[in-house]
């Protein structure tokens, strides 16, 4: 028996070697294919994300001649700069809270009121995907044409009720927050809908079988599971609103009440040559704020990942 096994092993040896070699070659080809498919993404990220970040960080510590300086940071703690950061944070927090709450309620209503693959679910998901990207000058123009000084909605309200809408409302902070909610709510639906989908009906049945009521189910089961994802989504909404520029620029063309608008004013300033460096400092500060928010979002997302 031993001699026959030895003979079989010797016979299988030469044929097994090419098979192992072919598997190694196939593995290398797969790795090369993966690298080739991801290379454009890394190139795009390096060109349009990493390189601008490096330019901003380096430029914040350079003077006009390219030497190292800290004078660009002198205006960071002036009253108008602090006010711009405070206003940006206020608008971002307010629009994010409204967008997160309304979007979460809409996601829950969509889960319990529509079939997973139904027409209503697909339509709302598609519309939310479009509206989440509908910002900038187009969004500002849409609101101006609707409820601006001579907007269709403004004229209709005046004709039907005699009430005249405040012509400066769109150029106020409540108006800006309302406009931001137009893309914050759909973005929240896209982000939070998978989290609500992950809640299993068996968990509620188990809670009820153990004598729990609806309040106990939400406070001890559903909310602890959804809270990390809700906080993570809120932080993403905050980062989105904090870095938004085009919509506010179309409404506040001559007022630097937000940090992105202050950066625009500093870049266009031709009277003070040091304003270019100050613009880099403002952008650097925005990068720090957004980076902190994204790190917090990632930490919360890791905790929520075990339930997905």
Placement of each model-derived feature along the sequence:
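Membrane-interfacial helix termini and adjacent extracytoplasmic/periplasmic loops
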Residues: 27, 70, 140-181, 251-255
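Interhelical loop and adjacent transmembrane-helix boundary motif
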Residues: 29-30, 75-80, 249-299, 305
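Transmembrane alpha-helices
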Residues: 39-48, 188-192, 200-201, 212-244, ...
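Short membrane-interfacial helix/loop motifs at transmembrane-helix boundaries
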Residues: 43-81, 146, 249-254, 308
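Non-cytoplasmic
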Residues: 52-56, 188, 229-264
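Transmembrane-helix boundary motif in ABC transporter permease subunits
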Residues: 95-128, 145, 298-302
């Amino acid at each position: 028996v031993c001699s026959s096994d030895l003979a079989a092993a010797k016979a299988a040896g030469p044929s097994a070697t090419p098979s192992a070699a072919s598997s190694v070659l196939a593995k290398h080809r797969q790795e090369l294919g993966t690298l080739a498919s991801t290379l454009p993404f890394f190139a795009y990220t390096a060109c349009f994300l990493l390189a601008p970040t490096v330019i901003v960080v380096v430029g914040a510590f350079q003077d006009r001649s390219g030497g190292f300086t800290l004078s660009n940071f002198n205006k960071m703690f002036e009253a108008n700069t602090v006010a711009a950061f405070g206003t940006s944070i206020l608008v971002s927090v307010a629009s994010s809270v409204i967008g997160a709450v309304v979007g979460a309620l809409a996601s829950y209503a969509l889960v319990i009121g529509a079939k997973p693959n139904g027409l209503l679910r697909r339509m709302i998901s598609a519309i939310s995907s479009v509206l989440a990207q509908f910002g900038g000058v187009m969004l500002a123009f849409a609101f101006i044409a609707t409820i601006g000084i001579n907007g269709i909605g403004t004229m209709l309200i005046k004709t039907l009720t005699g009430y005249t809408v405040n012509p400066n409302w769109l150029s106020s902070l409540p108006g800006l927050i309302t406009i931001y909610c137009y893309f914050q709510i759909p973005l929240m639906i896209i982000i939070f809908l998978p989290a609500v989908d992950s809640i299993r009906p068996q968990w509620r049945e188990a809670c009820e079988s153990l004598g729990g009521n609806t309040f106990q189910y939400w406070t001890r089961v559903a909310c602890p599971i959804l809270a990390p994802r809700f906080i993570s989504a809120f932080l993403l909404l905050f980062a989105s609103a904090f870095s938004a520029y085009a919509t506010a620029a179309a409404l506040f063309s001559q007022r630097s009440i937000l940090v992105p608008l202050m950066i625009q004013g500093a870049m266009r300033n031709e009277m003070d040559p040091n304003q270019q460096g100050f613009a880099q400092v403002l952008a650097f500060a925005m990068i720090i704020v957004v980076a902190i928010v994204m790190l917090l979002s990632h930490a919360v997302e890791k905790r929520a990942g075990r339930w997905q």
